[in-house]
Amino acid sequence: KEINSIYLNISWSDLGSWSEIFKILKSKIKKSFIKKNTFYRPWGLYRNYFRGENFLLKELIINRNSSISLQKHHYRSEHWTVSGGKPKITIGNKVFFKNPDETIFIPKGSVHRIENIYKKPVKIIEAQLGSILKESDIVRYKDIYGRIK
């Protein structure tokens, strides 16, 4: 099927070509997508990038001297890839220090945490796998921000 009209909420300009229109569309979609899918937390932020059946791809950014809760999930496992910084990761009673391009797997039901003890932000690409992929699937054990209920 052909599309013969596209609504753009932009100011008037002489675009000149379809490639210019696609550049504007791409930039608008990217900005609105990122803004809509960015969620701020006391430790930093996360962005949801892609959701499929039984999986979710996210980016976590943990600020310096911050950490996520010591927590577990009943319905999902997680696979983390470090894309920036040097996180301190706790899984059960084991502690790992990771570097960019290194990965770690968090099995469903495992107590875990990411800490940033350095100045540079920690960036993690998180792949969640499971039957329920909601923020409500968090059981917190320790939280420096007082979020344990």
Task: Label the predicted regions.
Residues K1-F105, S110-R113, I117, L133, ...:
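Left-handed beta-helix
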Residues R113-K149:
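Double-stranded beta-helix
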